[in-house]
């Protein structure tokens, strides 16, 4: 097995032939045509006109969007770029695009202008202090922490997604520390980058 040689455990061979398994999450419907146009717009540094729906606005709504990166965050893909409707850099979920995307010419909004994308933050995670010393030691070992802390470098624009994947709630502590497990130690340092901070 590869993990014996590298220390990294990935499931790349067919699972039916192995002693391992993985979750099969439902896939979100993503239009190939829309993704092709978004990738073309990224390479050409162009704007694209798209129809987009969201939970806050479930009706088809046209947007002019200047994409710069496609990101897989957990179980979904989104595209990062400048939204002219919102007048700022945003993440749009790929499965929420509707209709046909059309290129609209050069974009004045470059990836270098996306402060949250260009900024690197360090997330400092630690075992929930409400856990017993033995429980904290388990997590310290799981995550190979040094001095009971795990430091993770990430783009500020991706910090929320990383925290969600690590099941770290930044707003309140879960009622049971076994459910919370990890806490964000340096919340004040990265507060400006957190959703609904």
Q: Where are each of the predicted segments found?
A:
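Bulky hydrophobic/aromatic content
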Residues: 1-53, 165, 169-177, 181-186, ...
